Amino acid sequence: MSSRKSKNNSLIHTECLSQVQRILRERFCHQSPHSNLFGVQVQYKHLSELLKRTALHGESNSVLIIGPRGSGKTMLINHALKELMEIEEVSENVLQVHLNGLLQINDKIALKEITRQLNLENVVGDKVFGSFAENLSFLLEALKKGDRTSSCPVVFILDEFDLFAHHKNQTLLYNLFDISQSAQTPVAVIGLTCRLDILELLEKRVKSRFSHRQIHLMNSFGFPQYVKIFKEQLSLPAEFPDKVFAEKWNENVQYLSEDRSVQEVLQKHFNISKNLRSLHMLLMLALNRVTASHPFMTAVDLIEASQLCSMDSKANIVHGLSVLEICLIIAMKHLNDIYEEEPFNFQMVYNEFQKFVQRKAHSVYNFEKPVVMKAFEHLQQLELIKPMERTSGNSQREYQLMKLLLDNTQIMNALQKYPNCPTDVRQWATSSLSWL
């Protein structure tokens, strides 16, 4: 009887954990509109009112949301649109068009995407239009039910807005802003960009039709607020089916937020970047360690997740190099120390390596020059070194100037973790100014 009971408990636990994983992953990955906004309530109110004026009163508007990557621009617009669509008279009437500068790389593709999202492919058919403006006006005209007050408002969201400014003649931007200034179909044009100088990219005729409304997001919260965000992002909602499990989970999250080692991890991430995406990545990696046998997150999970986040990819490449390639990197390190970061060539590295070989007076590291050259070229392929300028067909490879893309700290840290690194190689790396 007891074994059956424990089996049932285990199944309940597994089911709870799968729900926890689903809820939190959705929160971390998709920044769903169900998550909370942090420190942008004023901006949210401004944007929400602007959208309501378009949807409810037929007032056309344009606005730019400006902020660094990960500051919450997409999350802000998603929240505002979700709230707007919850209004009964709006949900059936307002149309949304989402464009992205990375996908719609010219105005022709953008216009096709607008037609598709407005479900007007059948209306357009095989019609031939004289200009882009005529085509766009026809699309919006097709949405009208009668006069201006009964027209379908359209919300245009332009992600990576600065990339649209590079389109030929900025035709799309000109026509969208022109419609937002005229008494045609009510539209709201919302641009999302991380460039502060975005207005400098706009042509004079485009700029004159833009309302010059700007909403800035700057991640201005402090560390206490960052810890609060950490708690809110990990906590389970009140409507979670298993109340007992949710209470235990949330108590554990509260305990973690007060743990000194966890606070050190969070402080480190906060100092590097206030970007919530980096926090989500940390939490996602820690969440991956939660299983039926390990149902609650621990400080160790977060510490190990932090180490994965801050892992140096170039140092990891060094761990997989041959001893000869390691020796060449150490030779480059010494050349950088001697010549104060001046570029070097293969011949200089080879000479430095030969000094080491002759000093050790044994044949373990005594490779033929073509073999050393092959190892040098492999380092270039791995992008641990790079040429200072393009090579011409006439130039000799061994005299091409190179630059090392690893600093001394990275090299020494990688050597400490290098499996079975020979003692004399490690000593050579730590010696000052080579063997001079």
UniProtKB/Swiss-Prot annotation:
Q: Where in the cell is it found?
A: Nucleus
Residues holding ATP: G67, P68, R69, G70, S71, G72, K73, T74
Which coarse location class describes where this protein primarily resides?
A: nucleus
Q: What domain of life does the UniProt record list for this protein's source?
A: Eukaryota
A GO MF annotation of the entry reads: nucleotide binding
Tell me which InterPro entries the record gives: AAA+_ATPase, AAA_16, ORC4, ORC4_C, P-loop_NTPase
Keyword terms, alphabetized: ATP-binding, DNA replication, DNA-binding, Methylation, Nucleotide-binding, Nucleus
Family matches, as Gene3D superfamilies = P-loop containing nucleotide triphosphate hydrolases (3.40.50.300)
Q: Please list the residues that carry the modification N6-methyllysine.
A: K7
CDD domains, A to Z: AAA (cd00009)
ATP-binding keyword on record: yes
Question: Where does the signal sequence lie?
Answer: none
This protein's GO cellular component annotations are: chromosome, telomeric region; cytosol; nuclear origin of replication recognition complex; nucleolus; nucleoplasm; nucleus
- Please name the Pfam families in this protein's record: AAA_16, ORC4_C
**Gene Ontology terms describing biological process:** DNA replication initiation; polar body extrusion after meiotic divisions; protein polymerization
What's this protein's family per the entry? Belongs to the ORC4 family.
Q: What does this protein do?
A: Component of the origin recognition complex (ORC) that binds origins of replication. DNA-binding is ATP-dependent. The specific DNA sequences that define origins of replication have not been identified yet. ORC is required to assemble the pre-replication complex necessary to initiate DNA replication. Binds histone H3 and H4 trimethylation marks H3K9me3, H3K27me3 and H4K20me3.
**How would you summarize the oligomeric state and partners of this protein?**
Component of ORC, a complex composed of at least 6 subunits: ORC1, ORC2, ORC3, ORC4, ORC5 and ORC6. ORC is regulated in a cell-cycle dependent manner. It is sequentially assembled at the exit from anaphase of mitosis and disassembled as cells enter S phase. Interacts with DBF4. Interacts with POLQ.
The protein's name is Origin recognition complex subunit 4
Q: Which organism is it from?
A: Pongo abelii
What broad taxonomic lineage does this protein's source fall under?
A: Eukaryota, Metazoa, Chordata, Craniata, Vertebrata
Q: Which gene encodes it?
A: ORC4
